[in-house]
Each structure stands twice: as C-alpha cells, then as structure tokens.
C-alpha cells in the first residue's frame, strides 16, 4: 500500500538516498531542508521529489515523518510534530525497521563505507533485483527486491537499530572526536554492532582493532596477508585500475579487475567478493560486474578543464587523505600531485592535527582552505588552519575562495580537492579561473 512520507532534512546524504528509494517503490515522497544548495538535491529534483523550505504547513496528519539526525527540537517542523503529538522516526530507526523485509547486506567502518556500499550495490543489482542506499545520496528501491544493501554509520552509534544478515566492517579508526572519547570507545561501538549481525561478518584482517571484535556470527577476515580467510594476491596496479586474484582456504575463487585506484579499493573489492562468495553468488558474475563499476559521488570524481585534471574527493580524515593521494599517484604516476584540503570541524582538526600534517605530506604541494565548522559546534578560537600549515613539511599555503590563482603555479599537475565541507566552492573558483584563461588565450 502506498504511503506519503515527509523528510525533515531531505538533503542529507542518507536521507536523500532513502527518499529516492521510497519514491521508486511507489510511495509519495516530499521533504524540507535549508535553502543552501547541496549536491544530493540534483537527484531528488530529477526524480520530481518536492523540496520545501521548513514550515509547519508542510506537515499533515496522514504523513509518515522521517527526521534527519542533525535536526532537533529547535527545528520548527520537529517542534510542531512534538507539540501536536504527531509521531516521527529518526532516519536510523526507520531504516532498522525497513530492512526487516529483505536479506540485508550492511557496510560499516570508519573509512570506505560509501565506496564499498556502492561497489556491492552495483554488483548485486546487476545480478538480481536489489534495493540499496548509498551514503553519496544515491538510492534505488524495488518492491520485488529480495536483497537490500546499505551503509551503516557509527556516528552517535546510529547503527545500533540495525540487525543485518551480513555486514562488512572495513576498518576501525578514531574519528568524530565530538562524540567518541577515544579508540576504545569506537571499538566498543563496533563490537556492540557486530553482535547484532545474523549470518556473517567480513572484517579487514590487518586492522588490530578489528581483530578484537567478537560476535556470535562467523567472522571472515580479508586482506593481503596469509592467515586471512580471503586473500587478495598477484596484484597489478596500472593506470587503468587494479587486477588481482582472491583465494579462500587455499583455493583460487577468481581473478578480478576493478577500474579503481589505490590499495584501499582492492581491499574494498575483496570484502565485497568475500561477502558474495559466502552468500552463494556466482563468482564469474561478480567478476563481470566489478569491471563496470564507475564509482560513487565525491569519491575520486574526475573532470578535465582546459587540459587540467581535477579530482574531487570527500576525504576528511588523515587515513582517507593518504588513500586518495595513493590513488592519484597510481593513475597519474608522472604528474605532480597538488592537494587542496579543507579541514572539517574544529574538534577533528584539534584531535588529529599532527596526523593531518603527515597525511598531507604525501602530496607534492599543499593548499589549505579555512576550517569548515560543523553546525553542532562553536569556534572557540582553539585552532586555525594556519596551525596546520605550520606543521606541513611540503610547500604549503592558505588560499581563499576569492583567490585560488596560486594553484596556477604548477605544470603537469593533478589537482586533488579534498574535504567534507564546502571545498567544492574552491574547486568551482579554480574551474572558472581555468575557463577564463582559455577564453583569454583564444
């Protein structure tokens, strides 16, 4: 039976994906959010989903309300629902109920969730009818689907309502210092989540924290080293992607190619292969569809402007920065790697300042944008982007949206824009600068 859903905070990456999924399943979907443009809204607009400004008038009693985790009682629509005793569900609570209708495949981990969810979704949907929800704002819904693939987020322990059949856990790392007290707190959260997985867990076997995870379901370890249950080996990394074999219990289960770059993407693919092998999916079909994966939004997204290569990536943690730069070097081994990075949140910048500097030193040159503060925090003046610049050994300087011209001081370079805030504004400024150079040279 068709329902009417109203999303409070529909532009959030998970929220927009869920909205698209429910829309495709035949439900009536609308939502509200702030006016500022966010990259997820293009998909919503293309689907014909109405996006409204926040207003009490948006809510009627016949609607099912789904509220984004960033919106609290001070939001006028949330306040209205509470005042009139109109029930609503948080995104993660709704998802926990929704997945009960499917055989569910979850992807959790500090880094690589979105790319791995995207890869697993792509392979499975090309083999059989599959619904999925990816953290880049992409979702697909089918009322007849047997399988559901989704991203499982650890922030504020939002993954605790989830009880999937299968789950990949890519890694454990200290992040979200505004919520987690340290690495032990992060590990405990993942351990509690792991206990809820019903059939099997697939975890990176070379992660010391992950190896401490205990769960009732069987745990399969994947990685590069002998001793793992699923081992990626005979690896060839080229400018066209990565080729490798995977063995399980001493037997080769397939030879695979992914058109993706960086060691982390080989690990992501191995996790997907392991999960689908245990779930009984034909490995020949898996190999066929791995070859055609085109990536997810804001994860190593490339464009060429005026013969200049620009890469856009969501990387906002030191581990992710290292992985993104590694991928750029694999694809463009003869080019200078220029990193343009915007720190995301003051709490993360303070907690990981030294690690950010070490990670950015993997690039050849570094440019920094002003720190992007979260809506949940206040700038107390405890850290400035200049503090990070001072710790970077490689050539580095701070740039503004209004003046990105220092980036032109490089020949034969690849420009890697990284961040989870509004780093795309800096990227667009650079693209305009390049386009104007073309016009002036004509």
Curated annotation (Swiss-Prot):
Gene3D superfamilies: Mur ligase, C-terminal domain, Mur-like, catalytic domain, NAD(P)-binding Rossmann-like Domain. It is an enzyme of class 6 (ligase). One of its GO terms (molecular function) is UDP-N-acetylmuramate-L-alanine ligase activity. Keywords: ATP-binding, Cell cycle, Cell division, Cell shape, Cell wall biogenesis/degradation, Cytoplasm, Ligase, Nucleotide-binding, Peptidoglycan synthesis. It comes from the Bacteria. GO terms for cellular component: cytoplasm. Disulfide bonds: none annotated. ATP binds at residues 109-115. Its EC number is 6.3.2.8. It is found in: Cytoplasm. Pathway: Cell wall biogenesis; peptidoglycan biosynthesis. Signal peptide: none annotated. InterPro entries: Mur-like_cat_sf, Mur_ligase_C, Mur_ligase_C_dom_sf, Mur_ligase_cen, Mur_ligase_N, MurCDEF_pg_biosynth, UDP-N-AcMur_Ala_ligase_MurC. It catalyses: UDP-N-acetyl-alpha-D-muramate + L-alanine + ATP = UDP-N-acetyl-alpha-D-muramoyl-L-alanine + ADP + phosphate + H(+). GO terms for biological process: cell division; cell wall organization; peptidoglycan biosynthetic process; regulation of cell shape. Belongs to the MurCDEF family. Cell wall formation. This is UDP-N-acetylmuramate--L-alanine ligase. It comes from Streptococcus pyogenes serotype M3 (strain ATCC BAA-595 / MGAS315).
């Amino acid at each position: 039976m068709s329902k009417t859903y109203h999303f409070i905070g529909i532009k959030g990456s998970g929220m927009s994906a869920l909205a698209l999924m429910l829309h495709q399943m035949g439900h009536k979907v609308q939502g509200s959010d702030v006016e500022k443009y966010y990259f997820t809204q293009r998909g919503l607009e293309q689907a014909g989903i109405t996006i409204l400004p926040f207003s009490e008038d948006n809510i009627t009693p016949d609607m099912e309300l789904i509220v984004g985790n960033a919106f609290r009682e001070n939001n006028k629509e949330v306040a209205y629902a509470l005042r009139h005793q109109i029930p609503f569900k948080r995104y993660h609570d709704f998802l926990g109920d929704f997945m009960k209708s499917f055989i569910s495949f979850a992807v959790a981990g500090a880094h690589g969730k979105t790319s791995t969810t995207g890869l697993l979704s792509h392979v499975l949907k090309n083999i059989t009818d599959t619904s999925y929800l990816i953290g880049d704002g992409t979702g697909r819904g089918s009322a007849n689907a047997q399988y559901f693939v989704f991203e499982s987020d650890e922030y504020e322990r939002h993954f605790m309502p989830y009880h999937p059949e299968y789950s990949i856990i890519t890694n454990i790392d200290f992040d979200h210092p505004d919520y987690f007290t340290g690495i032990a707190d992060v590990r405990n959260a993942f351990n509690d989540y792991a206990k809820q997985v019903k059939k099997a867990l697939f975890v990176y076997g070379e992660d010391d924290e992950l190896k401490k995870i205990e769960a009732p379901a069987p745990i399969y370890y994947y990685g590069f080293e002998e001793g793992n249950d699923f081992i990626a080996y005979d690896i060839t990394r080229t400018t066209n992607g990565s080729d490798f074999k995977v063995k399980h219990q001493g037997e080769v289960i397939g030879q695979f190619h992914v058109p993706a770059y960086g060691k982390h993407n080989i690990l992501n693919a191995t996790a997907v292969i392991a999960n689908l092998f245990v779930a009984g999916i034909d490995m020949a079909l898996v190999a066929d569809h791995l070859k055609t994966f085109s990536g997810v939004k804001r994860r190593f997204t490339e464009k060429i402007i005026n013969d200049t290569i620009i890469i856009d990536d969501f990387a906002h943690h030191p581990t992710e920065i290292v992985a993104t730069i590694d991928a750029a070097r694999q694809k463009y081994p003869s080019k200078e790697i220029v990193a343009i990075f915007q720190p995301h949140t003051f709490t993360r910048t303070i907690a990981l300042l030294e690690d950010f500097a070490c990670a950015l030193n993997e690039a050849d040159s570094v440019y920094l944008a002003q720190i992007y503060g979260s809506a949940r925090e206040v700038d107390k003046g405890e850290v400035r982007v200049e503090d990070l610049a001072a710790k970077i050994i490689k050539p580095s300087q701070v740039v503004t949206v209004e003046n990105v011209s220092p980036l032109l001081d490089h020949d034969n370079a690849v420009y890697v824009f990284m961040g989870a805030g509004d780093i795309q504004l800096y990227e667009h400024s650079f693209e305009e600068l390049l386009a104007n150079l073309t016009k002036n040279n004509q």
